[in-house]
Amino acid sequence: MATKDPAVTTPDDSQLEAGRGNTGNNAGDALEKPSSSTGTMVDEPADPNVVDWDGPDDPEHPLNWSKTQKNLHLVIVSLFTLAANLAATMFAPGAEELATEFSITNSTVTAMTVSLYVLGFALGPLLLAPLSELYGRLIVYYGCNFVYIAFTIGCAFSTNVAMFLVFRIICGCAASGPMSIGGGTVADLFPQEERGKAMALFTVGPLLGPVIGPIIGGFVSENVGWRWTFRIILIFSGLIGVATVIFMRETNYTVLLQRKAQRARKETGNDKLVPKLTRNETPKQMLVRAIVRPLKLLIFSPIVLLVSLYTGILFGLIFLLFTTFPSVFQDVYGFSPGTAGLAYLGLGIGMILGLVLFSVLSDKMLKQKSGAARPEDRLILMKWLGPVTPLGLFIYGWTAKYAVHWIVPIIGTFVVGFGSLFVVIPGQIYLVDSFGAEAAASAMAANLLVRSPFGAFLDLTASPLYESLGLGWGNSVLGFICLLFTPVPWFFYTYGERMRTHFKVDL
Protein backbone atom coordinates (compact mmCIF):
# COMPACT_ATOMS: atom_id res chain seq x y z
CA MET A 1 0.00 0.00 0.00
CA ALA A 2 1.13 3.49 -0.74
CA THR A 3 1.23 6.33 1.69
CA LYS A 4 -1.49 8.92 1.74
CA ASP A 5 -0.12 12.25 0.60
CA PRO A 6 -0.38 14.95 3.27
CA ALA A 7 -1.86 17.36 0.73
CA VAL A 8 -5.27 15.95 1.62
CA THR A 9 -6.43 15.16 5.13
CA THR A 10 -9.71 13.60 6.21
CA PRO A 11 -11.14 12.55 9.57
CA ASP A 12 -10.26 8.97 8.64
CA ASP A 13 -6.52 9.44 8.23
CA SER A 14 -5.75 7.22 11.18
CA GLN A 15 -7.59 4.36 9.49
CA LEU A 16 -5.91 4.99 6.16
CA GLU A 17 -2.40 5.13 7.57
CA ALA A 18 -2.59 1.90 9.55
CA GLY A 19 -0.05 -0.63 8.38
CA ARG A 20 1.41 1.48 5.57
CA GLY A 21 5.01 2.20 4.73
CA ASN A 22 6.18 5.76 4.09
CA THR A 23 6.46 5.65 0.32
CA GLY A 24 5.27 9.20 -0.15
CA ASN A 25 2.76 8.53 -2.90
CA ASN A 26 -0.37 10.46 -3.79
CA ALA A 27 -3.48 11.23 -1.82
CA GLY A 28 -5.75 8.97 -3.74
CA ASP A 29 -3.83 5.75 -3.19
CA ALA A 30 -5.73 5.04 -0.02
CA LEU A 31 -8.83 4.71 -2.11
CA GLU A 32 -7.25 3.64 -5.39
CA LYS A 33 -5.90 0.31 -4.23
CA PRO A 34 -8.36 -2.18 -2.73
CA SER A 35 -7.28 -3.13 0.74
CA SER A 36 -6.96 -6.69 1.89
CA SER A 37 -9.81 -7.89 4.07
CA THR A 38 -7.68 -10.55 5.78
CA GLY A 39 -6.37 -8.20 8.43
CA THR A 40 -2.75 -9.16 7.82
CA MET A 41 -1.75 -5.59 6.94
CA VAL A 42 -3.31 -3.78 9.89
CA ASP A 43 -2.43 -3.48 13.54
CA GLU A 44 -6.04 -3.69 14.78
CA PRO A 45 -8.76 -6.19 13.78
CA ALA A 46 -11.07 -4.92 11.06
CA ASP A 47 -14.48 -3.66 12.16
CA PRO A 48 -17.00 -6.34 11.05
CA ASN A 49 -19.58 -3.64 10.38
CA VAL A 50 -17.36 -1.76 7.90
CA VAL A 51 -17.87 -2.79 4.28
CA ASP A 52 -14.67 -2.67 2.22
CA TRP A 53 -13.39 -4.19 -1.00
CA ASP A 54 -12.94 -7.98 -1.01
CA GLY A 55 -9.17 -7.84 -1.11
CA PRO A 56 -6.81 -6.22 -3.61
CA ASP A 57 -8.19 -8.28 -6.54
CA ASP A 58 -11.87 -7.49 -5.99
CA PRO A 59 -13.37 -7.58 -9.52
CA GLU A 60 -15.86 -4.85 -8.57
CA HIS A 61 -13.05 -2.34 -8.04
CA PRO A 62 -12.59 -0.20 -11.19
CA LEU A 63 -8.81 -0.68 -11.08
CA ASN A 64 -9.42 -4.41 -11.61
CA TRP A 65 -11.75 -4.08 -14.58
CA SER A 66 -10.61 -5.47 -17.90
CA LYS A 67 -8.35 -3.36 -20.08
CA THR A 68 -11.06 -3.22 -22.76
CA GLN A 69 -13.64 -1.95 -20.28
CA LYS A 70 -11.28 0.72 -18.93
CA ASN A 71 -10.27 1.92 -22.39
CA LEU A 72 -13.89 2.05 -23.55
CA HIS A 73 -14.74 4.36 -20.64
CA LEU A 74 -11.69 6.48 -21.44
CA VAL A 75 -12.64 6.83 -25.12
CA ILE A 76 -16.23 7.83 -24.31
CA VAL A 77 -15.13 10.44 -21.76
CA SER A 78 -12.53 11.77 -24.21
CA LEU A 79 -15.21 12.07 -26.92
CA PHE A 80 -17.36 14.00 -24.43
CA THR A 81 -14.60 16.56 -23.93
CA LEU A 82 -13.91 16.72 -27.68
CA ALA A 83 -17.56 17.54 -28.41
CA ALA A 84 -17.59 20.15 -25.64
CA ASN A 85 -14.52 21.92 -27.02
CA LEU A 86 -15.46 21.61 -30.69
CA ALA A 87 -18.56 23.62 -29.89
CA ALA A 88 -16.44 26.36 -28.31
CA THR A 89 -14.95 27.47 -31.63
CA MET A 90 -16.87 25.59 -34.33
CA PHE A 91 -19.52 28.29 -34.29
CA ALA A 92 -16.97 31.15 -34.40
CA PRO A 93 -16.80 31.42 -38.23
CA GLY A 94 -20.58 31.80 -38.29
CA ALA A 95 -20.72 34.51 -35.62
CA GLU A 96 -20.79 37.32 -38.19
CA GLU A 97 -23.62 35.61 -40.06
CA LEU A 98 -25.59 35.38 -36.80
CA ALA A 99 -24.85 39.05 -36.08
CA THR A 100 -26.27 40.00 -39.47
CA GLU A 101 -29.37 37.84 -38.99
CA PHE A 102 -30.09 39.22 -35.51
CA SER A 103 -29.05 42.81 -36.41
CA ILE A 104 -26.20 42.91 -33.87
CA THR A 105 -24.04 46.01 -34.33
CA ASN A 106 -21.97 45.79 -31.12
CA SER A 107 -18.77 43.79 -31.69
CA THR A 108 -18.58 42.89 -27.99
CA VAL A 109 -21.99 41.22 -28.15
CA THR A 110 -20.84 39.29 -31.21
CA ALA A 111 -17.73 38.13 -29.33
CA MET A 112 -19.92 37.05 -26.40
CA THR A 113 -21.63 34.47 -28.62
CA VAL A 114 -18.37 32.54 -28.34
CA SER A 115 -16.92 33.69 -25.00
CA LEU A 116 -20.04 33.04 -22.88
CA TYR A 117 -19.87 29.36 -23.78
CA VAL A 118 -16.27 29.15 -22.53
CA LEU A 119 -17.26 31.09 -19.39
CA GLY A 120 -19.70 28.27 -18.66
CA PHE A 121 -16.66 25.98 -18.36
CA ALA A 122 -15.70 27.93 -15.23
CA LEU A 123 -19.15 28.06 -13.63
CA GLY A 124 -20.39 24.49 -14.15
CA PRO A 125 -17.62 22.61 -12.30
CA LEU A 126 -18.37 24.43 -9.04
CA LEU A 127 -21.50 22.29 -8.73
CA LEU A 128 -20.92 19.36 -11.09
CA ALA A 129 -17.56 18.17 -9.72
CA PRO A 130 -18.82 18.04 -6.10
CA LEU A 131 -21.99 16.23 -7.20
CA SER A 132 -19.87 13.59 -8.93
CA GLU A 133 -17.88 12.94 -5.76
CA LEU A 134 -21.04 12.63 -3.66
CA TYR A 135 -23.50 10.86 -5.97
CA GLY A 136 -21.24 9.33 -8.61
CA ARG A 137 -19.74 10.18 -11.98
CA LEU A 138 -22.33 8.40 -14.12
CA ILE A 139 -25.38 10.40 -13.08
CA VAL A 140 -23.47 13.63 -13.80
CA TYR A 141 -22.50 12.39 -17.27
CA TYR A 142 -26.14 11.51 -17.96
CA GLY A 143 -27.49 14.80 -16.66
CA CYS A 144 -24.90 16.98 -18.40
CA ASN A 145 -25.42 15.28 -21.75
CA PHE A 146 -29.21 15.65 -21.50
CA VAL A 147 -29.00 19.36 -20.65
CA TYR A 148 -26.32 19.92 -23.29
CA ILE A 149 -28.40 18.32 -26.03
CA ALA A 150 -31.56 20.18 -24.99
CA PHE A 151 -29.94 23.61 -25.04
CA THR A 152 -27.91 22.90 -28.17
CA ILE A 153 -31.27 22.38 -29.86
CA GLY A 154 -32.23 25.75 -28.38
CA CYS A 155 -29.14 27.39 -29.91
CA ALA A 156 -29.87 25.88 -33.32
CA PHE A 157 -33.42 27.26 -33.31
CA SER A 158 -32.88 30.59 -31.49
CA THR A 159 -34.90 33.50 -32.82
CA ASN A 160 -33.08 36.39 -31.11
CA VAL A 161 -29.69 37.13 -29.60
CA ALA A 162 -30.86 37.14 -25.96
CA MET A 163 -32.27 33.63 -26.31
CA PHE A 164 -29.08 32.48 -28.04
CA LEU A 165 -26.76 33.90 -25.36
CA VAL A 166 -28.74 32.34 -22.49
CA PHE A 167 -28.79 28.94 -24.19
CA ARG A 168 -25.11 29.27 -25.04
CA ILE A 169 -23.90 29.78 -21.45
CA ILE A 170 -26.12 26.94 -20.20
CA CYS A 171 -24.56 24.70 -22.85
CA GLY A 172 -21.12 25.74 -21.61
CA CYS A 173 -22.02 24.87 -18.00
CA ALA A 174 -23.31 21.44 -19.07
CA ALA A 175 -20.28 20.81 -21.30
CA SER A 176 -17.97 21.51 -18.36
CA GLY A 177 -19.18 18.38 -16.57
CA PRO A 178 -17.14 15.80 -18.50
CA MET A 179 -14.16 18.19 -18.52
CA SER A 180 -14.15 18.58 -14.74
CA ILE A 181 -14.99 15.01 -13.69
CA GLY A 182 -13.18 13.21 -16.51
CA GLY A 183 -9.90 13.47 -14.60
CA GLY A 184 -11.64 11.79 -11.68
CA THR A 185 -12.79 8.97 -13.95
CA VAL A 186 -9.22 8.50 -15.21
CA ALA A 187 -7.97 8.39 -11.60
CA ASP A 188 -10.68 5.85 -10.74
CA LEU A 189 -9.70 3.50 -13.57
CA PHE A 190 -5.93 3.77 -13.96
CA PRO A 191 -3.11 3.46 -11.41
CA GLN A 192 -0.54 6.23 -11.30
CA GLU A 193 1.98 4.44 -13.51
CA GLU A 194 -0.59 4.13 -16.35
CA ARG A 195 -2.21 7.51 -15.97
CA GLY A 196 0.01 9.55 -18.30
CA LYS A 197 -1.18 7.93 -21.51
CA ALA A 198 -4.80 7.93 -20.30
CA MET A 199 -4.72 11.62 -19.36
CA ALA A 200 -3.09 12.44 -22.68
CA LEU A 201 -6.07 10.96 -24.53
CA PHE A 202 -8.52 12.67 -22.18
CA THR A 203 -6.85 16.03 -22.83
CA VAL A 204 -7.10 15.71 -26.63
CA GLY A 205 -10.52 17.38 -26.55
CA PRO A 206 -9.60 20.59 -24.71
CA LEU A 207 -6.49 21.01 -26.87
CA LEU A 208 -7.52 19.88 -30.35
CA GLY A 209 -11.24 20.71 -30.16
CA PRO A 210 -10.72 24.50 -30.35
CA VAL A 211 -8.25 23.97 -33.23
CA ILE A 212 -10.41 21.66 -35.35
CA GLY A 213 -13.63 23.55 -34.59
CA PRO A 214 -13.00 26.63 -36.79
CA ILE A 215 -11.84 24.46 -39.70
CA ILE A 216 -15.08 22.47 -39.71
CA GLY A 217 -17.21 25.47 -38.77
CA GLY A 218 -15.80 27.61 -41.57
CA PHE A 219 -16.89 25.20 -44.29
CA VAL A 220 -20.22 24.40 -42.60
CA SER A 221 -21.19 28.06 -42.09
CA GLU A 222 -20.10 29.00 -45.60
CA ASN A 223 -22.13 26.23 -47.25
CA VAL A 224 -25.20 25.51 -45.10
CA GLY A 225 -25.32 28.31 -42.48
CA TRP A 226 -24.39 28.83 -38.83
CA ARG A 227 -27.33 26.85 -37.43
CA TRP A 228 -25.95 23.64 -38.90
CA THR A 229 -22.84 23.89 -36.72
CA PHE A 230 -25.12 23.22 -33.74
CA ARG A 231 -27.00 20.45 -35.52
CA ILE A 232 -23.72 18.65 -36.21
CA ILE A 233 -22.68 19.00 -32.56
CA LEU A 234 -26.15 17.77 -31.57
CA ILE A 235 -25.78 14.58 -33.64
CA PHE A 236 -22.27 13.96 -32.30
CA SER A 237 -23.34 14.49 -28.68
CA GLY A 238 -26.40 12.29 -29.14
CA LEU A 239 -24.27 9.38 -30.33
CA ILE A 240 -21.92 9.83 -27.36
CA GLY A 241 -24.93 9.87 -25.03
CA VAL A 242 -26.17 6.55 -26.42
CA ALA A 243 -22.70 5.03 -25.94
CA THR A 244 -22.65 6.33 -22.36
CA VAL A 245 -25.94 4.64 -21.48
CA ILE A 246 -24.94 1.35 -23.11
CA PHE A 247 -21.31 0.97 -22.07
CA MET A 248 -20.42 3.12 -19.04
CA ARG A 249 -20.67 2.09 -15.40
CA GLU A 250 -20.13 3.94 -12.15
CA THR A 251 -16.45 4.31 -11.19
CA ASN A 252 -16.53 6.46 -8.02
CA TYR A 253 -15.13 4.32 -5.20
CA THR A 254 -17.16 5.92 -2.43
CA VAL A 255 -20.43 5.44 -4.30
CA LEU A 256 -19.57 1.84 -5.21
CA LEU A 257 -18.83 1.00 -1.57
CA GLN A 258 -22.08 2.69 -0.51
CA ARG A 259 -23.99 0.48 -2.94
CA LYS A 260 -22.10 -2.58 -1.74
CA ALA A 261 -23.00 -1.76 1.87
CA GLN A 262 -26.63 -1.21 0.89
CA ARG A 263 -26.77 -4.64 -0.76
CA ALA A 264 -25.11 -6.24 2.27
CA ARG A 265 -27.62 -4.63 4.67
CA LYS A 266 -30.47 -5.94 2.54
CA GLU A 267 -29.00 -9.45 2.31
CA THR A 268 -27.96 -9.81 5.97
CA GLY A 269 -30.52 -7.64 7.75
CA ASN A 270 -27.66 -5.96 9.62
CA ASP A 271 -28.50 -2.24 9.60
CA LYS A 272 -25.18 -1.39 11.27
CA LEU A 273 -23.17 -2.11 8.12
CA VAL A 274 -21.54 1.04 6.74
CA PRO A 275 -19.13 1.59 3.83
CA LYS A 276 -15.50 2.34 4.58
CA LEU A 277 -14.62 6.02 5.03
CA THR A 278 -18.20 7.01 5.79
CA ARG A 279 -18.47 10.49 7.29
CA ASN A 280 -20.93 11.33 10.02
CA GLU A 281 -22.56 14.12 8.02
CA THR A 282 -25.97 14.95 6.62
CA PRO A 283 -26.37 15.05 2.81
CA LYS A 284 -26.57 18.84 3.01
CA GLN A 285 -23.32 19.07 4.97
CA MET A 286 -21.59 16.74 2.50
CA LEU A 287 -22.81 18.78 -0.49
CA VAL A 288 -21.69 22.09 1.02
CA ARG A 289 -18.29 20.61 1.89
CA ALA A 290 -17.92 19.22 -1.63
CA ILE A 291 -18.89 22.51 -3.29
CA VAL A 292 -16.31 24.39 -1.22
CA ARG A 293 -13.51 21.93 -2.05
CA PRO A 294 -12.39 23.45 -5.39
CA LEU A 295 -12.29 26.92 -3.83
CA LYS A 296 -10.33 25.65 -0.83
CA LEU A 297 -7.82 24.02 -3.15
CA LEU A 298 -7.33 27.29 -5.03
CA ILE A 299 -6.96 29.34 -1.87
CA PHE A 300 -4.85 27.02 0.29
CA SER A 301 -2.82 25.01 -2.24
CA PRO A 302 -0.13 27.00 -4.09
CA ILE A 303 0.30 23.99 -6.37
CA VAL A 304 -3.29 24.12 -7.60
CA LEU A 305 -3.26 27.91 -7.94
CA LEU A 306 0.02 28.28 -9.87
CA VAL A 307 -0.48 25.25 -12.12
CA SER A 308 -4.00 26.47 -12.91
CA LEU A 309 -2.73 29.97 -13.69
CA TYR A 310 -0.03 28.59 -15.99
CA THR A 311 -2.44 26.33 -17.90
CA GLY A 312 -5.01 29.13 -17.93
CA ILE A 313 -2.58 31.56 -19.53
CA LEU A 314 -1.73 29.00 -22.23
CA PHE A 315 -5.40 28.23 -22.83
CA GLY A 316 -6.24 31.93 -23.15
CA LEU A 317 -3.28 32.66 -25.43
CA ILE A 318 -4.37 29.95 -27.86
CA PHE A 319 -7.86 31.48 -28.07
CA LEU A 320 -6.31 34.93 -28.48
CA LEU A 321 -4.06 33.61 -31.25
CA PHE A 322 -7.14 32.33 -33.09
CA THR A 323 -8.42 35.90 -33.44
CA THR A 324 -5.36 36.88 -35.50
CA PHE A 325 -5.56 34.08 -38.07
CA PRO A 326 -8.23 35.60 -40.36
CA SER A 327 -6.47 38.97 -40.62
CA VAL A 328 -2.99 37.47 -40.97
CA PHE A 329 -3.72 34.79 -43.55
CA GLN A 330 -6.43 36.63 -45.49
CA ASP A 331 -5.13 40.21 -45.38
CA VAL A 332 -1.36 39.61 -45.31
CA TYR A 333 -1.11 36.41 -47.36
CA GLY A 334 -4.28 36.68 -49.49
CA PHE A 335 -5.84 33.35 -48.50
CA SER A 336 -9.56 32.80 -49.15
CA PRO A 337 -11.76 32.44 -46.02
CA GLY A 338 -11.97 28.66 -46.48
CA THR A 339 -8.24 28.25 -47.08
CA ALA A 340 -7.42 30.56 -44.15
CA GLY A 341 -9.18 28.09 -41.87
CA LEU A 342 -6.52 25.53 -42.76
CA ALA A 343 -3.95 27.73 -41.00
CA TYR A 344 -5.25 26.25 -37.74
CA LEU A 345 -3.66 22.95 -38.77
CA GLY A 346 -0.22 24.20 -37.73
CA LEU A 347 -1.35 24.34 -34.11
CA GLY A 348 -3.20 21.05 -34.45
CA ILE A 349 -0.31 19.11 -35.96
CA GLY A 350 2.04 20.48 -33.29
CA MET A 351 -0.34 19.28 -30.59
CA ILE A 352 -0.75 15.85 -32.19
CA LEU A 353 3.01 15.36 -32.43
CA GLY A 354 3.39 16.50 -28.82
CA LEU A 355 0.59 14.16 -27.76
CA VAL A 356 2.28 11.16 -29.39
CA LEU A 357 5.64 12.04 -27.84
CA PHE A 358 4.10 12.62 -24.41
CA SER A 359 2.15 9.33 -24.54
CA VAL A 360 5.33 7.41 -25.32
CA LEU A 361 7.59 9.12 -22.79
CA SER A 362 5.49 10.05 -19.73
CA ASP A 363 4.56 6.68 -18.22
CA LYS A 364 7.84 5.14 -19.46
CA MET A 365 9.87 7.75 -17.57
CA LEU A 366 7.76 7.23 -14.45
CA LYS A 367 8.33 3.46 -14.49
CA GLN A 368 12.08 3.94 -14.85
CA LYS A 369 12.29 6.01 -11.66
CA SER A 370 14.03 4.16 -8.86
CA GLY A 371 11.91 3.88 -5.74
CA ALA A 372 8.38 5.21 -5.37
CA ALA A 373 7.25 7.66 -8.03
CA ARG A 374 6.27 11.17 -6.93
CA PRO A 375 3.56 13.30 -8.56
CA GLU A 376 6.37 15.81 -9.26
CA ASP A 377 7.96 13.33 -11.67
CA ARG A 378 5.18 14.27 -14.11
CA LEU A 379 6.76 17.72 -14.44
CA ILE A 380 10.01 16.60 -16.10
CA LEU A 381 8.69 17.01 -19.66
CA MET A 382 6.95 20.25 -18.68
CA LYS A 383 10.26 21.64 -17.38
CA TRP A 384 12.15 21.09 -20.62
CA LEU A 385 9.54 21.40 -23.39
CA GLY A 386 7.07 23.95 -22.01
CA PRO A 387 9.48 26.87 -22.69
CA VAL A 388 9.33 26.31 -26.47
CA THR A 389 5.85 27.92 -26.49
CA PRO A 390 7.10 31.53 -26.28
CA LEU A 391 9.62 30.73 -29.03
CA GLY A 392 6.70 29.84 -31.28
CA LEU A 393 4.93 33.10 -30.44
CA PHE A 394 8.04 35.10 -31.37
CA ILE A 395 8.38 33.25 -34.69
CA TYR A 396 4.71 33.69 -35.56
CA GLY A 397 4.50 37.38 -34.65
CA TRP A 398 7.63 38.70 -36.33
CA THR A 399 7.45 36.60 -39.52
CA ALA A 400 3.80 37.57 -40.02
CA LYS A 401 4.66 41.24 -39.43
CA TYR A 402 7.26 41.18 -42.21
CA ALA A 403 5.17 38.90 -44.47
CA VAL A 404 7.79 36.15 -44.62
CA HIS A 405 6.57 33.13 -46.62
CA TRP A 406 3.29 31.84 -45.12
CA ILE A 407 4.79 28.52 -44.06
CA VAL A 408 7.06 30.23 -41.50
CA PRO A 409 4.30 31.73 -39.29
CA ILE A 410 2.50 28.39 -39.53
CA ILE A 411 5.70 26.75 -38.26
CA GLY A 412 5.52 29.25 -35.40
CA THR A 413 1.98 28.11 -34.56
CA PHE A 414 3.19 24.49 -34.81
CA VAL A 415 5.79 25.25 -32.13
CA VAL A 416 3.12 26.95 -29.98
CA GLY A 417 0.88 23.88 -30.24
CA PHE A 418 3.73 21.50 -29.46
CA GLY A 419 4.93 23.46 -26.44
CA SER A 420 1.49 24.21 -24.98
CA LEU A 421 0.66 20.50 -24.91
CA PHE A 422 3.65 19.93 -22.61
CA VAL A 423 2.23 22.49 -20.21
CA VAL A 424 -1.46 21.59 -20.15
CA ILE A 425 -1.27 17.79 -20.00
CA PRO A 426 1.55 17.44 -17.41
CA GLY A 427 -0.08 20.17 -15.34
CA GLN A 428 -3.39 18.33 -15.22
CA ILE A 429 -1.79 14.94 -14.53
CA TYR A 430 0.24 16.52 -11.73
CA LEU A 431 -2.97 17.72 -10.09
CA VAL A 432 -4.66 14.32 -10.50
CA ASP A 433 -1.63 12.43 -9.15
CA SER A 434 -1.27 14.86 -6.23
CA PHE A 435 -4.86 14.47 -5.04
CA GLY A 436 -5.78 11.04 -6.41
CA ALA A 437 -9.21 9.58 -7.06
CA GLU A 438 -10.55 11.04 -3.80
CA ALA A 439 -10.28 14.66 -4.92
CA ALA A 440 -9.25 14.59 -8.59
CA ALA A 441 -12.57 16.01 -9.78
CA SER A 442 -12.31 18.91 -7.33
CA ALA A 443 -8.72 19.62 -8.40
CA MET A 444 -9.78 19.62 -12.06
CA ALA A 445 -12.75 21.85 -11.22
CA ALA A 446 -10.38 24.32 -9.55
CA ASN A 447 -8.20 24.21 -12.66
CA LEU A 448 -11.18 24.92 -14.93
CA LEU A 449 -12.35 27.72 -12.64
CA VAL A 450 -9.09 29.56 -13.33
CA ARG A 451 -8.43 28.40 -16.88
CA SER A 452 -11.80 29.02 -18.52
CA PRO A 453 -12.09 32.79 -17.87
CA PHE A 454 -8.77 33.22 -19.67
CA GLY A 455 -10.22 31.40 -22.67
CA ALA A 456 -13.44 33.38 -22.45
CA PHE A 457 -12.08 36.91 -22.08
CA LEU A 458 -8.40 37.10 -23.04
CA ASP A 459 -9.27 37.13 -26.74
CA LEU A 460 -11.28 40.32 -26.16
CA THR A 461 -7.95 42.10 -25.62
CA ALA A 462 -6.74 41.15 -29.11
CA SER A 463 -7.94 44.28 -30.92
CA PRO A 464 -6.40 46.87 -28.56
CA LEU A 465 -3.23 44.77 -28.18
CA TYR A 466 -2.49 44.39 -31.89
CA GLU A 467 -3.71 47.87 -32.82
CA SER A 468 -1.26 49.37 -30.32
CA LEU A 469 1.75 47.07 -30.77
CA GLY A 470 1.28 45.28 -34.08
CA LEU A 471 1.81 41.58 -34.74
CA GLY A 472 5.51 41.57 -33.84
CA TRP A 473 5.53 43.20 -30.43
CA GLY A 474 1.97 42.11 -29.68
CA ASN A 475 2.90 38.43 -29.90
CA SER A 476 6.21 39.14 -28.18
CA VAL A 477 4.29 40.45 -25.16
CA LEU A 478 2.39 37.15 -25.09
CA GLY A 479 5.68 35.28 -25.35
CA PHE A 480 7.17 37.20 -22.43
CA ILE A 481 4.08 36.42 -20.32
CA CYS A 482 4.65 32.72 -21.04
CA LEU A 483 8.31 33.07 -20.08
CA LEU A 484 7.29 34.43 -16.67
CA PHE A 485 5.63 31.09 -15.87
CA THR A 486 8.39 28.77 -17.11
CA PRO A 487 10.01 28.53 -13.62
CA VAL A 488 6.78 27.05 -12.18
CA PRO A 489 7.48 23.36 -13.03
CA TRP A 490 11.14 23.73 -11.99
CA PHE A 491 10.06 25.12 -8.62
CA PHE A 492 7.46 22.42 -7.96
CA TYR A 493 9.75 19.64 -9.17
CA THR A 494 12.20 20.64 -6.43
CA TYR A 495 9.88 21.86 -3.68
CA GLY A 496 6.46 20.42 -4.59
CA GLU A 497 6.57 17.47 -2.21
CA ARG A 498 7.62 19.75 0.64
CA MET A 499 4.82 22.20 -0.21
CA ARG A 500 2.21 19.44 -0.28
CA THR A 501 3.35 18.54 3.22
CA HIS A 502 3.39 22.12 4.46
CA PHE A 503 0.15 23.36 2.85
CA LYS A 504 -2.31 20.73 4.02
CA VAL A 505 -5.83 21.14 2.67
CA ASP A 506 -8.58 19.66 4.83
CA LEU A 507 -11.11 18.46 2.29
Curated annotation (Swiss-Prot):
CDD domains: MFS_Tpo1_MDR_like (cd17323)
Parts of the chain that traverse the membrane: 72-92, 111-131, 146-166, 169-189, 200-220, 228-248, 302-322, 341-361, 379-399, 406-426, 429-449, 472-492
Family according to the record: Belongs to the major facilitator superfamily.
Entry membrane topology: Multi-pass membrane protein
Molecular-function GO term, any one: transmembrane transporter activity
Disruption phenotype: Fairly reduces the production of fusarisetin A.
Localization per Swiss-Prot or TrEMBL: Cell membrane
Pfam families: MFS_1
Alphabetized Gene3D superfamilies for the sequence: MFS general substrate transporter like domains (1.20.1250.20)
Glycosylation sites: 64, 106, 252
Chain spans, region Disordered: 1-65
One GO term describing the cellular component: plasma membrane
Function of the protein: Efflux pump that might be required for efficient secretion of fusarisetin A or other secondary metabolies produced by the fusarisetin A gene cluster.
The protein's name: MFS transporter fsa7
Keywords noted in UniProt: Cell membrane, Glycoprotein, Membrane, Transmembrane, Transmembrane helix
Coiled coil: none
Intrachain disulfide bonds: none
Main location (coarse class): membrane
Keyword Isomerase: no
